[in-house]
């Protein structure tokens, strides 16, 4: 059965698959660049 969970940062869509939950379309963060990236 489809699930929709509302979180402070947005909505998370998933599915209840009789015994386990499956998350779909989880938003990802942008990669760290510039001053936010690790330095050697």
Swiss-Prot record:
It catalyses: a carboxylic ester + H2O = an alcohol + a carboxylate + H(+). The keyword Iron does not apply. GO terms for molecular function: carboxylesterase activity. Its EC number is 3.1.1.1. Keywords: Hydrolase, Serine esterase. Belongs to the type-B carboxylesterase/lipase family. This is Esterase-4. It comes from Drosophila mojavensis (Fruit fly). The gene is Est-4.
